[in-house]
Regions:
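Repeated scaffold domains used in trafficking and secretory/extracellular systems
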Residues: 26-36, 65-74, 101-110, 139-151, ...
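Residue position within the beta-strands of beta-propeller blades
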Residues: 1-2, 40-42, 78-79, 114-116, ...
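Small side chains
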Residues: 10, 32-33, 70, 115, ...
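Peripheral, non-catalytic segments that deliver or gate enzyme domains
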Residues: 25, 63, 77, 108, ...
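Generic structural signal for coil-to-beta-strand starts
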Residues: 18, 38-39, 47, 76-77, ...
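Short loop/turn segments that connect beta-strands within the blades of beta-propeller domains
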Residues: 6, 35-36, 44, 73, ...
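Eukaryotic tandem repeat interaction scaffolds
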Residues: 87, 100-109, 113, 117-122
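Surface-exposed loop/turn elements that mediate protein-protein interactions on large endomembrane-trafficking
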Residues: 5-24, 47-62, 83-98, 121-138, ...
Length: 177
């Protein structure tokens, strides 16, 4: 049977580019992380999937509504759901706790989470337990989902330049092309 669609594949590779794991059920925002010998990713039906890299057994783990986007640090997985709620998931016991609202798009950078979206569209900096550090909504071109940290600044590339600010949302600026 001929179809008009195509199937996307994601490959987990080792340092020598050998395929360790392959999956075809990729979510809208491709993300993957290896924590404690397990590979985690969001599948095409918005579930967080855990794959044991020794046995290659996989299972969906709790996601309190559909997982929309995810990021991680060295200890936890953070994910937002369709209701713009931000959760912190422990890979050890697979438990999740809600830490914030209005965080559809986000990025985990060092000790802070840079979030935006939700009903009010505000941009908020949270600590990793959900405490609000600052509102950076006035930083027009600072995107939460594409933020990256270099030394003591957060940067985002936008159409026309680079936006930057201090880790706490202060001293916002833009460099234009």
């Amino acid at each position: 049977m001929r179809g008009t669609g195509y199937i996307l594949h994601a490959y987990l590779l080792d340092k020598n580019f050998n395929i360790i794991y392959c999956h075809y059920n990729i979510g809208k925002f491709p993300w993957g992380a290896i924590l404690n010998g397990n590979y985690y990713y969001i599948n095409d039906i918005n579930e967080i999937v855990k794959v044991n890299l020794t046995t290659f057994e996989s299972k969906s783990i709790a996601s309190n509504g559909k997982a929309f986007m995810a990021d991680n640090d060295e200890n936890f997985i953070y994910y937002s759901n369709e209701f713009s709620e931000l959760y912190k998931l422990s890979p050890d016991d697979e438990s999740s706790i809600k830490i914030a609202d209005n965080a559809l798009f986000f990025s985990v950078q060092n000790k802070y989470i840079y979030a935006s979206g939700g009903d009010n569209g505000n941009k908020i900096i949270y600590d990793k337990n959900g405490k609000i550090i600052a509102d950076y909504s006035a930083c027009v071109n600072m995107g939460a989902d594409s933020a990256f940290q270099i030394n003591d600044k957060i940067y985002t590339i936008f159409n026309g330049g680079v936006a930057y600010m201090d880790l706490d949302g202060k001293n916002y600026g833009e460099m234009m092309q």
